[in-house]
């Protein structure tokens, strides 16, 4: 395990316990890195150095300027709901299926146990944006339902797992085996 030592003065924990006043008095910056089992355990700091560090922290926590911005610069205006275009339209980035999409999909014969994930919707939109085809809103929803059904069928009907997640090992030892 790598670690970074923040002072050039290093001492073992046994030496610090033996005579901590002398160790801290000899330190150049008022701080000593204390090692236990050849690994940094903690830092020992003189009261004067601790006062300096606290004063520095307090100084840095104060704003550097007394200029305050109006609250209007921090508040984002609420996005107006996107109206569904009439007639046929090409897929666009902000397209969303209806709120009762799962129920509608069931009426079309596509039973979705879980709602459509943001990743599934993004992949669908990206694919059909590139295609440039035009369909009615209801047709887009039917295509989304079928697309999600097909993509999930290869994974037992569940959304695909995140490929970046790290699996956790099973530490349980079955009966009859030694651990």
Curated annotation (Swiss-Prot):
UniProt superkingdom: Bacteria
Region listing for Disordered, in residue ranges: 151-179
InterPro entries for this protein: DnaT, DnaT_DNA_bind
Protein family membership: Belongs to the DnaT family.
Biased composition (Polar residues): 151-168
UniProt record, GO biological process: DNA replication, synthesis of primer
GO cellular component: primosome complex
Quaternary structure and partners: Homooligomerizes. Interacts with PriB. Component of the replication restart primosome. Primosome assembly occurs via a 'hand-off' mechanism. PriA binds to replication forks, subsequently PriB then DnaT bind; DnaT then displaces ssDNA to generate the helicase loading substrate.
Known function: Involved in the restart of stalled replication forks, which reloads the replicative helicase on sites other than the origin of replication. Can function in multiple replication restart pathways. Displaces ssDNA from a PriB-ssDNA complex. Probably forms a spiral filament on ssDNA.
Keywords attached to this entry: DNA replication, DNA-binding, Primosome
Protein name: Replication restart protein DnaT
Cysteine disulfide partners in this protein: none
Protein's UniProt keywords contain Transit peptide: no
């Amino acid at each position: 395990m790598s670690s970074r030592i923040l002072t050039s003065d290093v001492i073992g924990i046994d030496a610090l316990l033996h005579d901590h006043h002398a160790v801290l008095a000899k330190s150049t910056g008022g701080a000593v890195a204390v090692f236990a089992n050849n690994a940094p355990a903690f830092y020992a700091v003189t009261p004067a150095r601790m006062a300096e560090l606290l004063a520095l922290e307090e100084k840095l926590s104060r704003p550097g300027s007394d200029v305050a911005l109006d609250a209007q610069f921090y508040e984002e205006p609420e996005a107006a709901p996107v109206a569904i275009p009439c007639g046929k339209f090409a897929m666009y980035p902000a397209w969303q299926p209806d709120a009762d999409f799962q129920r509608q999909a069931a009426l079309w014969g596509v039973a979705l146990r879980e709602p459509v994930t943001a990743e599934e919707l993004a992949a669908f939109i990206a694919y059909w944006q590139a295609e440039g085809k035009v369909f009615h809103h209801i047709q887009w929803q039917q295509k989304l339902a079928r697309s999600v059904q097909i993509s999930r069928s290869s994974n037992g009907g569940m959304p695909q797992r995140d490929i970046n997640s790290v699996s956790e090992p099973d530490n349980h030892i079955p009966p009859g085996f030694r651990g």
